[in-house]
A protein has these predicted regions:
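Non-catalytic alpha-helical coupling and interface elements of nucleotide-dependent molecular machines
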Residues: 128, 135, 143, 618, ...
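Short, flexible segments with low predicted structural confidence
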Residues: 40, 268, 446, 776, ...
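Carboxylate-rich, polar loop motifs that coordinate divalent cations or form catalytic acidic clusters
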Residues: 1-733, 740-741, 745, 749-752, ...
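Glycine- and acidic
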Residues: 695, 809, 855
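Short, intrinsically disordered, charge-balanced linker/junction segments flanking boundaries
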Residues: 137, 227, 672, 855-868
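Cytosolic signal-transmission helices at domain junctions
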Residues: 321-326, 753-820
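Histidine phosphotransfer helical core of two-component systems
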Residues: 820-866
Length: 868
């Protein structure tokens, strides 16, 4: 009997664990230290009025707006253990330090210490673990003291007989769990005893949860939950036994009254107001760490968990829920198709065909289905599945039978050919037909004349079969009237004028054949019998290429599956409209390209994932962020030509020096659901400039701006193109000095001086030129005068020479005459002298004659004169 008892207990436990782990649960986004670039441990969470999230991290205050993580240190670089936000202040507590951060005019967080204002109270070894507010006062609680701040003064309190373990606020009161002591209410001055700890099994109350105006729920560390309304009674849950073993550390209630309980040893539990467990996150399914140090429910009703290693974001308010295997040992693989029958879902995966029971939440692999399964489909109450080996028929109890004469199956559709309703099946080799017999679909025959691997089939209104080749192009097939053979086949590798490398996806929308390729959507025109671009669809879906499936919700609503997203399209008044976009990255479960399909079941849409499926309630129109988080300008940074940077005020009239011409604008739109948001930026001003940009990033940089006044505008749009926020900023860049009015005045003075000096220089130059011309003229005149004088001199010389020549001739003649005369006279004188000597003449007469001769004979002086 004892053995049977333990076996039953073990089986129940296993069933419980399977059911608990294999349920639809919210998506979880995990952030690790490498993502936010700070310490591993996170102790507390809070949210600002602008939607930003703040975390007490082992390295300081961590800030996140959905795009950027920033870390802000506190004095001493200590761990931030507690965070509390009131209006524009972010209060923090750390080791021997507490105070608040506040944004400056330039959007920079600055720390203001409050503990430094304490008088006559040493902060030695006091570490602030909790921050609460009551009646406008902020209380900072350590394990040995508490401190109050009224906005002006800081006061310290200590009671060595009563040392608080936790401060909590509930119903407008502060309650306190004392260390190894009882439970109290704190009125701001004194502690009022409420009950002894023995009434909660000698345990510590670690959290309080709302439970009406006059009562609340107390969450204990090791003994579950208790209701307090003056009396104390246990509050039963489905997980009391587990909570007693997992060491509860934190708890919070969501806006829709779901209790989140965080443990030290086994992650997070969610229970409703009746104590029923909704789901459990731990290291085995969604969380990256089991130790929960803080919990917080944000404005969007999603839950943040501060973990011993990282941060977890639970998409509690999302209409998307995920189903994943019970534990790490079960691997679904990639889910290719989903079917629903009764209480069970059937999942065709590349590992096999799985059955998921909604009531027991049990997930099992059906026998003989191992390997690649391409589809599972309920057709008129019969459940078919196709895999690499056979076509399968699934019975009511999950029994599997193989349909004979089938060797593989890739697609099975219900259609009408030549007035007869049939099932048409494709495979790796041939096409097959099923017909109804005794109200059941049974295999009929293989179609002759066609052998090719086909991935998907569609049949148009004229009975033409369009078959997507598994690797290249698409086939257009016409069957014989008796459906026994192929009458005509054409392989198509072009869409329009474009040659398509690879398979061409074929789909059906509103009875119309649609093709998808890397170049967009095409359709078959029944009138022209040509494949033409599907302009209306391409116009609204420019971001989807190579869509691989279409699933009809109604005749006018369709889900299209692309490689990176799912899109809900509606046809209304002759136009197609995008109603919803869901990015695959929302699921943190990458899919194999071109196999992420959709299954629609009443009001719920299911998405195929890798190792799971996601459900989405169609009652929710949009996953897009609302104006709960407004678009704001988070920073404006200006850079100068010499590489200096400065943050600018975010409001007022801002004017920059002329050398600050490069600006970086950062905007903030806090949202955390991985939704498709894009930003439209416009910068106008300067010298008639207008720049427009559309980006995914929440920042934009402008460089080398001209001087002048500018207006910067940023707008945020959701995935449907709806504007969800806008912000405007005005600034001016001063004229550079060389273009300033002072510079122009200086330029005028300089120009005037230049004109003056130029005029003067020009006048002087003209005078100098005239002087030089005059001097040159004088020189020329002098030269001419000298030439004339020289000519005159030459003429005079010539005249003198002529006269001289004439006179020379005369002189020569005279000289010759004189010479001749002298010779005669000399001879005569000689004769006379001889006669005189001889005494032939009278001496007196001769002397007289000789005297006369001597007087007429030229002397030596005469000859000298003649020679000269």
């Amino acid at each position: 009997m004892l053995f049977k008892y333990w076996v039953v207990c073990l089986l129940l436990f296993i069933l419980f664990i399977q059911a608990r782990a294999s349920s639809f649960m919210p998506a979880v986004t995990n952030y690790l230290a490498k993502d936010y670039e700070a310490g591993y441990q996170n102790w507390a969470c809070a949210q600002g009025s602008n939607g930003e999230m703040y975390f007490g991290n082992s390295q300081g205050l961590l800030v996140y707006d959905g795009y950027r993580w920033t870390l802000h240190k506190v004095p001493g670089n200590h761990i931030v253990r507690s965070v509390y936000v009131k209006e524009d202040r972010i209060y923090v507590g750390a080791f021997e330090e507490f105070g608040y951060f506040k944004y400056s005019e330039a959007g920079t967080l600055r720390y203001h210490s409050l503990s430094k204002f304490l008088k006559n109270f040493p902060m030695e070894n006091n570490e602030i673990w909790n921050i609460v507010e009551l009646d406008g006062r902020i209380y900072f609680q350590s394990f040995s003291a508490w401190f109050s701040y009224d906005g002006k003064m800081v006061h310290a309190f200590r009671n060595r007989q009563q040392q608080p373990l936790y401060f909590y606020t509930q119903n407008g009161h502060i309650y306190t769990q004392m260390i190894d002591e009882d439970f109290y209410e704190f009125d701001g001055k004194d502690f009022l005893h409420l009950f002894p700890r023995s009434q909660v099994n000698d345990d510590n109350v670690v959290a309080l949860l709302p439970d009406g105006d006059d009562s609340f729920l107390m969450v204990t560390e090791n003994n579950g939950l208790f209701r307090y309304n003056g009396d104390i009674t246990p509050w039963k849950t489905d997980i009391d036994a587990e909570l007693k073993k997992q060491r509860v550390n934190r708890a919070v209630m969501t806006n829709d009254s779901i209790f989140m309980i965080g443990t030290v040893l086994n992650g997070i539990y969610a229970i409703d107001r009746k104590g029923h467990c909704l789901w459990h996150f731990n290291l085995d399914n969604r969380l990256d760490n089991n130790t929960v140090l803080g919990l917080f429910c944000d404005k969007d009703n999603n839950v943040w968990a501060a973990l011993d290693d990282g941060i977890a974001y639970i998409h509690h308010n999302s209409p998307v829920m995920l189903l994943t295997p019970a534990n790490h040992e079960t691997k679904l693989g990639m889910v290719y198709d989903i079917a629903h029958r009764g209480d069970c879902f059937y999942l065709a995966t590349n590992q096999g065909l799985y059955e998921y029971h909604q009531v027991t939440e049990n997930l099992r692999l059906l026998p003989h289905t191992e390997g690649q399964n391409w589809y599972v489909k309920d057709i008129d109450g019969q459940l078919f599945a196709g895999n690499n080996a056979h076509t399968l028929l699934i019975g009511e109890k999950g029994n599997v039978s193989v349909i004979s004469n089938t060797n593989s199956s890739t697609c099975l559709i219900k259609c009408t050919l030549y007035g007869e309703e049939i099932l048409l099946e494709s495979s790796y080799a041939n096409l097959r037909i099923y017909k109804k017999k005794n109200g059941q679909w049974t295999f009929s025959h293989v179609i002759d004349g066609f052998i090719a691997p086909v991935m998907h089939l569609e049949v148009d209104q004229s009975g033409v079969i369009w078959a997507s080749h598994m690797y290249q192009g698409v086939y257009k097939i016409v069957l014989s009237d008796d459906l026994s053979a192929v009458k005509g086949v054409r392989h198509i590798s072009h869409l329009g004028s474009e040659y398509i490398i690879g398979p061409i996806q074929v789909m059906k929308m509103r009875g119309r054949i649609v093709f998808s390729s890397p170049n967009g959507f095409y359709t078959y025109d029944d009138i022209t019998r040509q494949i033409i671009p599907f302009q209306k669809l391409n116009a609204i879906l420019p971001y989807i290429r190579n869509a691989h499936s279409v699933v009809s919700v109604t005749n006018d609503r369709f889900w299209l599956s692309g490689s990176h997203e799912y899109v809900l399209v509606e046809y209304a008044e002759g136009e197609y409209i995008v109603k919803q976009r869901i990015l695959i990255e929302l699921f943190d479960s990458p899919c194999i390209e071109n196999y992420n399909n959709v299954f629609v079941d009443n009001d719920v849409v299911y998405f195929n994932l890798n190792n799971g499926i996601a459900s989405y309630s169609k009652n929710t129109d949009s996953l897009s962020p609302t104006l709960e988080s407004a678009l704001s300008l988070s920073s404006v940074t200006a850079s100068s030509s010499d590489k200096k940077e400065k943050r600018l005020p975010l409001s007022g009239n801002v004017e920059l020096e002329s050398n600050y011409r490069d600006l970086l604008f950062s905007v903030s739109l806090p949202h955390y659901n991985k939704l498709s948001v894009h930003f439209h930026y416009v910068l106008q001003g300067g010298q008639g400039m207008a720049l427009t940009s559309d980006l995914k990033e929440p920042e934009i940089r402008y460089g080398s701006l001209d001087y002048g006044e500018y207006t910067f505008q940023a707008e945020a749009y959701n995935d449907l193109g709806q504007k969800i926020g806008e912000v405007e900023y005005h600034f001016a860049i001063a004229r550079p000095f060389y273009l300033s009015y002072y510079a122009f005045a200086l330029y005028l003075i300089v120009l005037t001086a230049l004109v003056y000096f130029f005029s003067k220089w020009r006048a002087n130059r003209a005078m100098e030129k005239k002087r030089k011309e005059y001097e040159a003229e004088q020189v020329q005149q002098n030269i001419k005068m000298r030439e004339q004088e020289h000519l005159i001199t030459l003429q005079q010389q010539q005249l003198l020479e002529a006269e001289l020549s004439a006179k020379s001739k005369d002189l020569a003649s005279m000289a010759l005459g004189v010479f001749a005369k002298n010779e005669v006279l000399e001879k005569l004188r000689t004769v006379v002298q001889e006669s005189l000597v001889k005494g032939q003449y009278g001496r007196k007469n001769l002397e007289s004659l000789l005297k006369l001769i001597n007087e007429n004979i030229e002397t030596q002086e005469f000859w000298d004169v003649f020679q000269n």
